[in-house]
Regions:
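N-terminal export/assembly segments and adjacent metallocofactor-ligating motifs
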Residues: 1-264, 275, 282, 302, ...
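N-terminal leader/propeptide and maturation segments of large enzyme subunits in energy/redox metabolism
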Residues: 95-112, 129-130, 264-303, 384-388, ...
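Conserved short loop/turn motifs at secondary-structure junctions
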Residues: 134-143, 297-301, 324-331, 363-364, ...
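Extended redox/cofactor-interaction regions of prokaryotic respiratory oxidoreductases
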Residues: 148-216, 221-227, 251-255, 344-468, ...
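Acidic/polar loop patches that form or flank catalytic/metal-binding clefts of enzymes
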Residues: 162, 268-270, 306, 320-321, ...
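Glycine/threonine-rich phosphate-binding loop and adjacent beta-strand/alpha-helix elements that clamp
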Residues: 188, 480-503, 514, 518
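Short acidic (Asp/Glu) and glycine-rich catalytic loops that position anionic groups and cofactors
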Residues: 233-238, 285-291, 315-323, 393-394, ...
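Long, contiguous, secondary-structure-rich segments that constitute the structural scaffold
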Residues: 510-561, 629, 634-647, 651-742
Length: 742
């Protein structure tokens, strides 16, 4: 984009100060209006924001000072939000593509878009006798409660096909439900009370920068910080002790530490005798099957280090473990989480302020989900059975689904689900809050799946790779152009999103799109859709709140959030402070009969990591300057991270004849990716690391080489097994010396 055209955008916001070399303008806060917003991304921190608007234009955002968690400072991604809102690359109008992938887009009206979409839906219903040929794939592009109107829209049309589950954290969710009956973690702000902190498979320096201040404060008060990770991450570099373990060996390490507690008499006998179920059986398993030396051989640490770690953890009180989501994205991820939970429980650190096995929670998500839970039309039919589609938040098919339910396919095997579905086949796909081509797995298979579809509709803000494979794209609002409410799955603050500006161009929020579709399809075929046809944000927000939410946050209505974010009022900052667990026994369950019933071991036993004949373990975490395929396309982020690389250890690079910046091909049986190499000791010798991100000007996609391998757990609570994103393998070859990839 030429400098002149960029400068013509509102306030010249897309032109850097460096480029213009303009003198600074004195800041006068009286010339601004301030609005309340929240970052709705799939991120630990869910920052509470204050948005500064001048002359109808967002000038900058800052953290809400009322939130002791955000503490007035968003991350670099949050600071870049104006670049997202005013990006010239935003989808501005409803568009139709003549041939998918051709790039031949033409602008259409909202009326035409709704009519074409509604006509296709009615065609499917006439052809199949149901709406099962209509599928929804949606996840975490936005986590505002009103964004669940997309699910409600689908339910209001009838019983449809849903992609159930989550690629994010399901194995760990199931594991903690087997152990404690629910997923619930301490307030992250109480980490300041910890005397010993293990960060296990997480990188908060990149993924939860606001949590780092509590970790640092704990260290200032004498706490020791330990990071366990195969990669020397930014967090690991800041730790007092970094332990590099082999990928997927976390369960063995935790069990080895647990065995040492038994050997040294360091088990909290009060907890295991009075608040736990099945501990004698677990101790017997440890004595008969686990030694510290066995664990050391599997995880790659010395036996002495394992013993020292276990003893140091139990020598102080409280001590805590942060269980990262990356750690459970293995074929044995759920088993690994159960083993870590067991170690923390044996040490007596469950239900203790400053302690805990911290994973996540949904305790502040007690909305009514009115936008999501819509009734199907009278006479609608679907899959025989009463169960609705499962998600982290409950049934999405409507509370009156008695005779029929939606058809459920695995979100982590989206392509396979589309290809295999029949009677009826998936004919039409609605994509919202998601970018399957960037975030789902086995991209070559995804292409084949999309070729099978008769219509693809994407609701998005940018022309990403999935949109390129769509027939119709609908422009959606950013968080600064709509009403919403956002809770966190990590901290305990609740924030409102109020429109700071009017919707840009012709963008509309998910809720308004649902009401428009309802009006259109009911005009064409009365009674075809039950979704309310009136769009009134106050009514919708009113219906999401209840007495429980009001009491938890000390508010009378959502309007109170306009004064600033509110924190949940809890008896203690510790999860399970009363040791009243939600398991069948009412106790912490070292032995879970429910896990055994669901095909797992009753005890948290060792399960090995996947193996391969390929020489390198492939890791594809997200980069500091993006969340999955979001943000990295913005101009500011391109300055920090303009090009993707594969990171390889010096000794491995030497064996392959690869030097810094050489052009290489990373490949496996799924596909291949070409890019440049970076040589670093931050990765192990048998590792290749490629950060997942969306680079719009480059042919780069890690999903070319990531298979849709399932994790061991996740089905019970989320409707599908998790994704073993890190149980992947690859090889690499040199294809060019010191060249850049176009």
């Amino acid at each position: 984009v030429a400098l002149g055209s960029v400068a013509a955008l509102p306030g010249g916001l897309l032109t850097s100060r460096c480029a213009l070399a303009q003198p600074p303008v004195p800041f006068n806060p009286k010339t601004y209006k301030i609005y309340r917003n929240a970052c709705p991304r799939n991120c630990y921190d869910t920052c509470s924001l204050k948005t500064w608007v001048k002359d109808g234009v967002i000038t900058f955002v800052e953290g809400a000072p009322e939130s002791t968690f955000t503490h007035g400072t968003p991350c670099v991604k949050g600071l870049s939000y104006p670049r997202r809102v005013y990006s010239p690359d935003r989808i501005k109008y409803p568009m139709a593509q003549d041939v998918r992938g051709s790039g031949n887009w033409r602008r259409i009206s909202w009326e035409e878009a709704m009519q074409r979409i509604a006509a296709k839906m009615l065609e499917i219903k006439k052809k199949d006798g149901s709406m099962l040929g209509l599928a929804l794939t949606k996840y975490s592009g936005k986590f505002g409660v009103l964004n669940y109107a997309v699910e409600g829209m689908m339910s209001s049309l009838g019983y449809t096909t849903r992609f159930a589950g989550t690629p994010c954290w399901p194995a760990g969710i199931d594991a903690q439900n087997y152990d404690m009956g629910d997923m619930w973690c301490n307030d992250p702000e109480d980490m300041v009370k910890a005397k010993y902190i293990i960060i296990w498979g997480a990188n908060p320096a990149w993924c939860s920068m606001h949590s780092m201040k509590y970790i640092y404060q704990a260290r200032e008060q004498g706490a020791k910080i330990v990071v366990i990770d195969p990669l020397l991450s930014q967090t690991a570099a800041k730790a007092d002790l970094y332990l590099r373990v082999r990928p997927g060996s976390d369960g063995a390490l935790a069990l080895g530490m647990a065995r040492h507690l038994v050997d040294k008499g360091l088990v909290d006998q009060d907890f295991v005798n009075n608040d736990a179920h099945g501990y004698p059986e677990f101790e017997a398993y440890l004595r008969n099957n686990v030694t510290v030396e066995w664990a050391a051989e599997i995880c790659g640490l010395s036996a002495d280090v394992i013993r020292q770690l276990a003893e140091e953890f139990t020598a102080v009180n409280p001590a805590t473990v942060w269980i990262g989501y990356g750690m459970q994205r293995h074929v044995n991820g759920g088993a690994n989480v159960r083993a870590i939970d067991a170690f923390v429980a044996m040490s007596g650190n469950i239900g203790v302020e400053g302690g805990g096995a911290r994973y996540g929670h949904l305790h502040t998500w007690g909305f009514n989900y009115n936008a999501m839970l819509q009734k199907p039309p009278v006479g609608a039919i679907g899959i025989p059975g009463a169960a609705g589609t499962t998600s982290e938040f409950g049934a999405a098919a409507g509370s009156d689904a008695v005779q029929y339910s939606d058809r459920s396919l695995n979100i982590n095997q989206t392509a396979q689900g589309i290809l295999e579905a029949n009677d009826p086949p998936v004919r039409m796909l609605w994509v919202a809050c998601k970018n399957p081509f960037a975030q789902d797995f086995d991209r070559s298979k995804m292409k084949k799946a999309f070729e099978k579809l008769e219509m693809v509709v994407c609701a998005d803000q940018f022309f990403n790779e999935t949109v390129q494979h769509a027939d119709i794209v609908l422009p959606v609002t950013t968080a600064f152009e709509e009403w919403n409410v956002d809770a966190s799955y990590w901290h305990y603050w609740l924030s409102i999103n109020q429109p700071a500006i009017k919707p840009m161009y012709e963008a509309k929020c998910d809720l308004e799109i649902a009401t428009m579709l309802s009006r259109t399809i009911n005009k064409m075929a009365p009674g075809s859709c039950t979704f309310p046809q009136e769009f009134d944000h106050k009514r919708w927000l009113d219906q999401e709140f209840n007495d429980g939410m009001a009491k938890m946050f000390g508010i009378s209505s959502w309007d109170d959030l306009l004064d600033g974010p509110k924190k949940a009022i809890l008896p203690s900052s510790a999860a399970w402070y009363d040791r009243k667990f939600k398991t069948p026994s009412g106790k912490y369950e070292f032995k879970s009969e429910l896990a055994e019933k669901n095909g797992h071991t009753a005890l948290p036993e060792y399960k090995p990591e996947a193996e391969s004949k390929l020489p390198f373990h492939l890791f594809t975490p997200h980069v500091q300057f993006g969340i999955h395929s979001q943000f990295i396309n913005l101009d500011w982020m391109q300055v920090f991270y303009p090009e993707p690389f594969v990171y390889i250890h010096p000794s491995s690079a030497k064996k392959k004849g690869i030097s810094e910046n050489d052009r290489v091909k990373v490949f496996n049986n799924i596909g291949e990716v070409e890019l440049r190499a970076k040589v670093t000791t931050n990765v192990p010798e048998d590792f290749l690391v490629m950060y997942e991100a969306w680079f719009p000007k480059r042919q780069y996609n890690v999903q070319n080489i990531v298979a849709d391998t399932p994790a061991d757990m996740g089905l019970m609570k989320t409707g599908a097994p998790g994704a073993a994103i890190h149980s992947q393998f690859a090889d690499v070859v040199l294809i060019g010396k010191g060249e850049s990839v176009a």
